[in-house]
From Swiss-Prot:
GO terms for biological process: defense response to Gram-positive bacterium; killing of cells of another organism. Residues 1-22 form the signal peptide. It comes from Isometrus maculatus (Lesser brown scorpion). Belongs to the non-disulfide-bridged peptide (NDBP) superfamily. Short antimicrobial peptide (group 4) family. The modification Lysine amide is found at residue 39. It is found in: Secreted; Target cell membrane. Amphipathic and cationic peptide with an alpha-helical structure. This is Peptide Im-4. Its main location: secreted. Expressed by the venom gland. Antimicrobial peptide that probably forms pores in target membranes. Has antibacterial activity against Gram-positive bacteria S.aureus NBRC 13276 (MIC=5-10 uM) and B.subtilis NBRC 3009 (MIC=2.5-5 uM) but not against Gram-negative bacterium E.coli NBRC 3972. Fragments comprising residues 4-17 and 5-17 have been detected in venom but it is unclear whether they have a physiological role or are simply due to degradation. It comes from the Eukaryota. Keywords: Amidation, Antibiotic, Antimicrobial, Membrane, Secreted, Signal, Target cell membrane, Target membrane.
Length: 74
């Protein structure tokens, strides 16, 4: 075989193995996500993550209102 063909085959094999490794690496995460979705844990985790951010946002909003209330009008 010519060197060009060997290089092309090597590149194709390299790309295919890279994609296979990425897919194999995703499998445990997909299985864990599927199990947690079946058990209903994922929804609770997302709600727990969202609520503190919402509280912090409200606190920041109140702080800004106080700051702007004390500023003079021009």
């Amino acid at each position: 075989m010519k060197f060009q063909y060997l290089l092309a085959i090597f590149m194709i094999v390299l790309v295919v193995t890279d994609h296979c490794q990425a897919f194999i690496g995703m499998i445990p995460g997909l299985i864990g996500g599927l199990i947690s979705a079946i058990k209903g844990r994922r929804r609770r985790q997302l709600e727990a993550r969202y609520e503190p951010q919402q509280r912090n946002f409200r606190k920041r909003e109140i702080d800004f209102e106080k700051l702007f209330a004390n500023m003079p009008d021009y």
